């Protein structure tokens, strides 16, 4: 219609009026001759127009009101049937209509006039034009007028003139459109005024047409009649129709339905028409198409089937398309039928053209995803409904399959290769001969599909996403067109692609909307789809969303099987890269969509299809599960056994780009990869890269495929897990074309990017990826068992890559990731292990390097999580794994050492996880790490970790693979202890804080903390741990380690022990030191005595260390000494401890055990330790000499070879001396107060130990077994030297019993012989009067005792006799050396010979006891001189015992081993008697000395008249000196005994007298021995005896008659004996004649003569009253006998005789008679 603005403007109105007038004038001119009425009417009209123009303000309205009159002239003109006039009139009428100045009445008149012209066949085109203008410019034509106008157009359509027909057809279409447009306009006009009825949704009863508004009614009537006409029924409204075609009717119906769907949807009347008229009509008209089967025999059916008619069928399909598209919601049931029909039309038995238009129709549906969604909701989701959507998709699939199964009749359908006839490859064939280039037939010239010999080209039919049909648009065709080869397949292919694209876009859009509505934020990244967890789509709380989800799922479930079947077939058949790309993209899209919706089975099915496409033909059959339906229940295997090597026929046209080995346990040849395989692989990579978040469990499928492809292509892992092309020699049968070679880096890059993109996956998806890789790796591991073939490392490499890019959330995947890699590290295949370790250590290092939020230093849990796998590697026995682990630790220390913090325990645990079976190199590497820790990182680690450092250092000490490391580790322990010392305050503070925290936590949990050395303070526990570890090393099997550890332990305790709390010392003593002593003692006593030949290599072992026993002895010595030193230096700390007494006892027990050891070294050292704890060796005080603390210097371990594992750390420099640190940090040691340590119980315990040691060690052996152990002299010396100091502490309570015990030990000690081996070093030469150290010690011990007794209380002095007894025993050794049990000892003189035979068997040599005995004698004499008057000495008959003791050497005299002995004995006797005799005389009445006198007499007798002979070489001077000694004895008798004869027992005096008589002459015996003669030659002695005798007889006043009698008898006997000797000599001389008498006889007579001379002299000197007269008579009676001797021939006798006779001159003057008388009487 014309615009109002253009027709109502003044200019337009003016122009209209002018034109009207002009038209009327022209009409008047034309008709003035032939048609006067018309002329008049025209002129009348001119006037009318003028009047209207002149009078009316609104010209157009006025014209319209008078239009019937205005138009009348023109109508009349048309009635003339004159062409020119008619044309003029029609033009004028059109002008009026265009200005909308025609009223309804006028319009009716015009239509009637037009009808007449039509019936007359005039101006047909003008008529059509006029009708069109009339209906389009205004809405005044209704009802019958409108009907008549439309019929007029229809009638003109069926003329014989094509132009008219076509113009009429176009006019009809336009008119029909105008009618409906009017209705739409009418609805728009009234929509606000009147509420519209609700759109119809189902069957409703027909409402009365009268309810419709005018335009609506016209439209209704028109549409109804169109249906009638198409159905070949009479119209109701279009009265006058004479002819109609169905094709045209269907076109009109389609245009109305397509252009005005809202009319039918908003008006029930129209909806009713659709349901009741249109749908049945369509179904009815479809009937021929449904029933017809191409190629079926007509005779087989009862009635001939009508052949489908292309124009109608095609138009019906168009109508159906519109119905489905526009009115699906109204016609649910009907559409179900239509859709089912569409599907049927695809059947193979339908004509090609029908299938083509059907597939085009379906294509139109496929580009409408919302429509498809509706189908799914309305049909597929209803319980008992046809699954329409599924059927459509399946039908497309079947259709495509059928095209390959039934070759089309076109010339291009000839097959290029018979099925199965392509070249196949066998395992033995040369892979290069199977055609590495494209096939040579025409099949590759055009894009096409080829399957089993059927070749179908791909045609370009429409642009993506549109359904531009070809045959549905052929409205002008009457005959069925020829469908070109490939057209239907190409459309069907596009149907599939558009279907996938459409539903994917729609569902993803709805998902996105659902997310937005549910406020779910999806994290997006470039080139990645939003990663949504399928389980979260959409939020299930919203029922609407639930509904949406169920629709999406149903759509997928309905279509995926058909889609997959079709796409898989097409993928297999495709020879075109673009087509393949589209197919793969569709499959990928579907897989992604299924993944988003959590539909596992379809997702896996599509992925499987892509995977199959990626792998060589038939390879996939064993790798992937071919059953799509059951795919979700299957596990995907990568094993690939039984791979079929036959190339299928469908791939003969494919370009082979690579030939390689399959990944299988037993490869049976080679497999080929085509360009399509590589293309599929890329799609697979793309899928995983972009849609990894939705893969879930199908990751395994994807990765398994990629692994096989990577293997076939020869890609190998490199650093970081990226895959790089392997070396050319990797596989002898791997052949790669140039094309694929250039692709490999790209594929490798995409692979890496794929795993890099895992950082954008959500957590669940990431877990799926990790699980899949782990599963894949497990299978690769299984394949590698018992197989030397290179394993597949794909999974391990990609686990590494995945881990590295997901460090920001490493926690969620760490455990499964590292857990699996640890399993890999345990695999027997070295290459597999190597990569497992590489991956694991790289991840750990990367994890520690990564900047986590919060930082690792603040996230202890994460740090421990990262380090834990490193620790778990320690459990793996493989050498290479441990090496890798330790390399990793070293790198961690170097890069992260300062920030490890809470991770230290784990790292240290790894370093310390050493085992002896690991070999030297591993231990060296681990030790290198430890050295670095100790030198560089002690200050940075938490103090709580220091204990672990100690444990680890200790474990290196204990390992037995590398001695130098053990020794160096002990040095490290010293450095560690020094560090503890330097930073003691800091460490203690940190440990205490930690302890408080632990105690608090334990209290909250209600548990008790259980820690070693509890309840010592934490810092002390640290020290105790260090000590305990050193203690363990002290009992190592290697001597060097034991020695170094022992030195370090005691140095550490000595240097740093002051830091310990007082109470902790209890633990040190009991848990460390005593425990160590126990272990050392046990090991020492059970050590092997076998000789060790050498120390390995060229090292010679000293004989003192050539058995394990001797080596352990050294350890025992060191340990005991160390403990004793601690007891000594720290006693002020130890003594206040609760159990010090018990500890003291234990220590003494250890000392005793050691002292009684069979090892001289140990036993001697034990005594030194004993001395130390008794403080015989006084300890150096700290406050006196701070620089020289005992044991402060750190021991330097002895290195047998170089230690190459020195860490790259800095040495720990100690800037200050330990003494300074001690004074700075610790309280100075207090001097030990006497009262502190004077605890008698301790000292008595020591005494008891000493006694037990002494008793056991000096006990003589029972048998003379060669193996008898004899204690050494140094040992015994040390033992005895202990006593004096010990005695100082026990002297107050030292009893007689104790003294006797002591005596036994002293006696035993000096009785012990020495080995001939040792004698040259201990024995003095026989001539030297030197005491051994032992003998000196023994005498010193006794000296100490006697001095204490001397100054001690009275009750102590009873011990004197015991001391004398002891000394007496020692004195006796001079003559009778002690026997040590039954042991045979050699005399010292014989031992000299053995000193030369160095290697002769050891013999036992008795010591030279003479000096010792003599010294003892001197001591005894000295002591007696001091103590002679003591009551105990008197009471216990000490003097008698002394004399008895002296009697032995005196009686032996010349027979004594040493001449000095008897001489000393004599002098000692003289000294003793000079003191003792006065005491004896004092106590003579008490009888206490009664037994002493006979002993003394015997002693004198034995000495003065010894039976021993002097040696032959005795000189005269010596003899005279000896005689002088005898004289001294006699003088003692004359001075000390005889003067006091009245106080002395008479028996004793008698014996003395007899002895003196015997001494004066010796001529009583009848035979003279040499000895007697010698004695007799002691003239001076005889003289003294005689003089003494005489003095004794006459000098003293006779106090008793008995005494005088004894004197007289003595003289009488003397004279009688002289008389007898003289007589016998005279007689013998006479008988001898001239022969001289024996010398002894001559000597005897000379002696007698001298005695007579002496007697007379003595008698002269004696007071006369003392001489009995009888004596004088006897003297004088000798004279005659003397005279008789004058005849003797011996001059010597003559001389003596002369001397004897001379004194008789005094008898020549007789005395007074009275006196003589008296004398005779």
Swiss-Prot record:
Compositionally biased tracts (Basic and acidic residues): 516-526
One Pfam family named in its UniProt record: Sec7-like_HUS
Disordered: region residues: 414-439, 516-539
Transmembrane segments: none
Residues forming coiled coils: none
Keyword terms: Protein transport, Transport
Keyword flag Transport: yes
Keyword Hydrolase set for record: no
Membership in a protein family: Belongs to the MON2 family.
Known function: May be required for traffic between late Golgi and early endosomes.
Protein name: Protein MON2 homolog
Organism listed in the record: Xenopus laevis (African clawed frog)
């Amino acid at each position: 219609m014309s615009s109002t603005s253009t027709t109502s403007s003044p200019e337009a109105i003016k122009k209209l009026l002018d034109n009207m007038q002009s038209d009327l004038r022209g009409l008047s001119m034309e008709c003035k001759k032939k048609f006067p009425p018309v002329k008049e009417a025209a002129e009348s009209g001119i006037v009318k127009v003028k009047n209207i123009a002149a009078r009316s303000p609104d010209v157009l309205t006025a014209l319209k009101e008078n239009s019937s009159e205005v138009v009348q002239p023109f109508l009349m003109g048309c009635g003339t049937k004159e062409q020119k006039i008619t044309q003029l009139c029609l033009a004028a009428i059109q002008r009026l209509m265009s200005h909308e100045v025609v009223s309804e009445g006028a319009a009716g008149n015009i239509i009637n006039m037009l009808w007449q012209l039509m019936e007359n066949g005039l101006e047909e085109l003008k008529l059509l034009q006029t009708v069109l203008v009339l209906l389009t410019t205004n809405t005044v034509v209704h009802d019958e007028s409108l009907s008549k106008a439309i019929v007029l157009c229809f009638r003109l359509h069926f003329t014989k003139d094509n132009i008219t027909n076509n113009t009429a057809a176009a006019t009809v279409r336009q008119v029909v459109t105008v009618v409906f447009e009017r209705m739409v306009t009418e609805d728009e006009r009234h929509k606000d005024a009147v509420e519209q009825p609700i759109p119809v949704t189902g069957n409703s009863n027909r409402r009365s047409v009268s309810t419709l508004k005018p335009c609506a009614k016209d439209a209704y009537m028109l549409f109804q009649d169109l249906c009638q006409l198409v159905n070949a029924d009479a119209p109701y409204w279009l009265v006058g129709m004479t002819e109609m075609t169905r094709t045209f009717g269907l076109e009109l119906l389609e245009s109305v339905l397509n252009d005005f769907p809202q009319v039918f949807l908003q008006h029930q009347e129209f909806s009713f028409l659709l349901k009741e008229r249109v749908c049945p009509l369509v179904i009815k008209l479809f009937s021929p198409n449904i029933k017809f089967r191409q190629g079926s025999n007509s005779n087989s059916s009862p009635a001939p089937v009508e052949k489908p008619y292309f124009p109608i069928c095609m138009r019906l399909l168009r109508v159906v398309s519109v119905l489905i598209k526009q009115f699906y919601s109204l016609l649910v049931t009907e559409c179900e039928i239509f859709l089912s029909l569409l599907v049927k039309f695809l059947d193979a038995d339908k004509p090609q053209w029908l299938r083509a238009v059907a597939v085009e129709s379906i294509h139109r549906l496929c580009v409408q995803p919302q429509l498809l969604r509706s189908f799914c909701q309305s049909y597929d989701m209803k319980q008992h409904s046809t699954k329409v959507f599924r059927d459509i998709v399946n039908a497309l699939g079947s259709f495509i399959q059928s095209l390959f199964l039934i070759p089309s009749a076109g010339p291009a359908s000839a097959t290029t290769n018979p099925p199965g006839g392509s070249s196949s490859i066998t395992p033995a064939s040369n892979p290069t001969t199977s055609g590495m280039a494209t096939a040579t037939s025409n099949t590759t010239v055009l894009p096409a599909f080829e399957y089993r010999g059927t070749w179908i080209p791909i045609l370009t039919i429409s642009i993506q996403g549109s359904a531009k049909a070809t045959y549905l648009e052929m409205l002008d065709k009457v005959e069925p067109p020829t469908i070109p080869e490939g057209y239907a397949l190409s459309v069907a292919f596009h149907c599939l692609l558009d279907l996938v694209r459409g539903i994917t876009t729609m569902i993803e859009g709805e998902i996105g909307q659902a997310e937005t509505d549910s406020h779910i934020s999806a994290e997006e990244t470039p080139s990645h789809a939003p990663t949504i967890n399928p389980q979260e789509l959409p939020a299930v709380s919203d029922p609407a969303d639930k509904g949406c989800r169920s629709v999406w799922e149903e759509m997928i479930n309905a279509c995926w099987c058909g889609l997959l079947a079709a796409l898989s077939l097409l993928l297999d058949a495709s020879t075109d890269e673009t087509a393949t790309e589209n197919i793969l993209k569709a499959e990928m899209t579907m897989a992604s969509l299924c993944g988003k919706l959590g539909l596992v089975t379809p997702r896996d099915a599509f992925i499987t299809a892509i995977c199959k496409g990626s792998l060589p033909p038939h390879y996939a059959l064993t790798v992937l599960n071919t059953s799509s339906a059951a795919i979700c229940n299957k596990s995907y295997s990568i094993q690939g056994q039984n791979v079929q090597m036959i190339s299928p026929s469908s791939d003969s046209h494919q370009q082979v780009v690579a030939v390689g080995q399959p990944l299988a346990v037993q490869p049976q040849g080679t497999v080929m990869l085509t360009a399509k395989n590589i293309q599929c692989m890329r799609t697979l990579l793309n899928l995983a890269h972009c849609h990894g978040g939705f893969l879930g469990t199908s990751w395994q499928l994807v990765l398994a495929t990629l692994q096989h492809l990577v293997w076939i292509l020869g890609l190998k892992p490199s650093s970081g897990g990226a895959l790089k092309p392997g070396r050319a020699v990797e596989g002898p049968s791997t052949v790669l074309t140039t094309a694929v070679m250039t692709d490999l880096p790209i594929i490798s890059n995409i692979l890496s990017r794929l795993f890099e993109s895992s950082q954008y996956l959500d957590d669940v998806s990431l877990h799926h990826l990790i699980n899949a890789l782990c599963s894949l790796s497990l299978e690769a591991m299984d394949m590698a068992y018992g197989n030397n073939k290179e394993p597949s490392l794909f999974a391990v490499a990609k686990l590494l890559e995945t881990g590295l890019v997901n460090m920001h959330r490493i926690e969620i995947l760490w455990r499964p990731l590292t857990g699996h890699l640890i399993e890999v590290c345990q695999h027997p295949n070295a290459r597999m292990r190597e990569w497992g370790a590489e991956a694991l250590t790289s991840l750990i290092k990367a994890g520690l390097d990564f900047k986590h939020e919060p930082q690792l230093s603040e996230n202890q849990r994460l740090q421990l999580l990262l380090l834990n796998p490193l620790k778990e590697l320690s459990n793996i026995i493989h050498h290479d794994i441990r090496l890798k682990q330790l390399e990793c630790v070293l790198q961690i220390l170097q890069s992260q050492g300062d920030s490890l913090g809470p991770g230290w325990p784990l790292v240290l645990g790894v370093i310390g996880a050493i085992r002896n079976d690991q070999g030297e190199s591993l231990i060296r590497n681990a030790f290198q790490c430890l050295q670095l820790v100790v030198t560089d990182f002690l200050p940075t680690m938490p103090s709580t970790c220091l204990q672990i450092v100690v444990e680890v250092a200790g474990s290196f000490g204990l390992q037995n693979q590398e001695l130098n490391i053990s020794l160096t580790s002990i040095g490290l322990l010293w450095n560690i202890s020094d560090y503890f010392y330097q930073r003691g305050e800091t460490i203690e503070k940190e440990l205490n804080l930690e302890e408080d925290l632990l105690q608090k936590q334990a209290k909250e949990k209600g548990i008790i903390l259980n820690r070693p050395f509890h309840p010592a303070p934490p810092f002390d526990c640290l020290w105790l741990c260090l000590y305990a570890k050193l203690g363990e090393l002290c009992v190592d099997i290697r001597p060097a380690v034991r020695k170094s550890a022992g030195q370090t332990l005691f140095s550490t305790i000595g240097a740093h022990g002051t830091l310990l709390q007082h109470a902790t010392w209890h633990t040190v003593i009991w848990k460390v030191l005593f425990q160590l002593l126990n272990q050392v003692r046990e090991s020492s006593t059970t050590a092997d005595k076998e000789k060790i030949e050498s120390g390995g290599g060229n090292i010679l072992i000293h004989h003192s260390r050539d058995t394990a026993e001797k080596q352990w002895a050294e350890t025992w010595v060191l340990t005991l000494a160390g403990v004793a030193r601690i007891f000594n230096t720290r006693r002020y700390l130890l003594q206040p401890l609760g159990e010090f007494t018990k500890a003291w006892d234990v220590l003494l027990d250890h000392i005793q055990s050691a002292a009684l050891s069979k090892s001289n070294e140990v036993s001697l050292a034990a005594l030194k330790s004993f001395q130390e704890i008794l403080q015989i060796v006084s300890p150096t005080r700290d406050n006196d000499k701070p620089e020289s603390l005992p044991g402060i210097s750190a021991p330097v371990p002895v290195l047998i070879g170089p230690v190459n594992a020195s860490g790259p750390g800095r040495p720990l420099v100690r800037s200050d001396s330990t003494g300074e640190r001690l004074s700075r940090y610790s309280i100075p040691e207090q001097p030990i107060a006497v009262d502190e340590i004077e605890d008698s119980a301790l000292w008595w315990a020591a005494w008891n130990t000493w006694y037990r040691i002494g008793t056991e060690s000096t006990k003589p052996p029972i048998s003379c077994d060669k193996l008898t152990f004899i204690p050494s002299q140094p040992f015994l010396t040390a033992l005895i030297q202990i006593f004096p100091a010990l005695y100082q502490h026990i002297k107050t309570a030292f009893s007689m019993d104790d003294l006797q015990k002591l005596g036994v030990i002293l006696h035993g000690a000096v009785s012990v012989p020495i080995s001939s081996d040792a004698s040259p070093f201990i024995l003095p030469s026989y001539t030297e009067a030197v005491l051994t150290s032992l003998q000196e010690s023994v005498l010193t011990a006794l000296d100490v005792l006697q001095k204490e007794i001397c100054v001690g209380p009275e009750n102590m002095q009873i011990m004197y006799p015991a001391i004398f007894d002891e000394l007496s025993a020692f004195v006796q050794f001079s003559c009778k050396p002690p026997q040590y049990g039954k042991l045979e000892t050699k005399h010292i003189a014989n031992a000299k010979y053995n000193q030369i035979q160095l290697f002769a068997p050891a013999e036992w040599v008795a010591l030279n006891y003479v000096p010792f005995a003599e010294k003892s004698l001197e001591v005894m004499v000295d002591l007696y001189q001091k103590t002679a008057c003591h009551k105990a000495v008197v009471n216990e008959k000490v003097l008698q015992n002394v004399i008895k003791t002296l009697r032995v050497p005196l009686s032996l005299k010349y027979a004594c081993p040493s001449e000095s002995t008897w001489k000393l004995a004599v002098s000692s006797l003289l000294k003793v008697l000079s003191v003792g005799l006065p005491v004896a005389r004092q106590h003579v009445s008490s009888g206490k000395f009664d037994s002493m006198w006979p002993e003394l007499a015997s002693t004198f007798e034995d000495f003065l008249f010894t039976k021993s002979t002097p040696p032959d070489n005795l000189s005269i001077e010596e003899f005279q000196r000896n005689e002088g000694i005898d004289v001294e004895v006699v003088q003692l008798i004359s001075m000390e005994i005889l003067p006091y004869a009245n106080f002395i027992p008479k028996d004793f005096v008698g014996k003395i007298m007899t002895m003196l008589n015997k001494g004066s002459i010796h001529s009583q015996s009848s035979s003279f021995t040499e000895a007697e003669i010698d004695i007799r030659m002691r003239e001076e002695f005889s003289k003294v005896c005689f003089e003494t005798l005489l003095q004794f007889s006459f000098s003293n006043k006779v106090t008793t008659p008995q005494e005088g009698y004894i004197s007289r008898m003595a003289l009488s006997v003397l004279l009688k004996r002289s008389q007898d000797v003289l007589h016998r000599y005279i007689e013998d001389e006479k008988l001898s004649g001239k022969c001289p008498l024996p010398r002894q006889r001559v000597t005897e007579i000379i002696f007698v003569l001298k005695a007579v001379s002496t007697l007379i002299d003595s008698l002269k000197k004696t007071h006369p009253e003392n001489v009995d007269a009888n004596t004088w008579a006897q003297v004088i009676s000798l004279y005659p006998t003397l005279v008789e001797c004058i005849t003797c021939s011996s001059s010597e006798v003559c001389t003596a005789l002369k001397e004897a006779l001379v004194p008789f001159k005094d008898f020549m003057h007789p005395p007074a008679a009275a006196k003589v008388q008296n004398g005779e009487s």
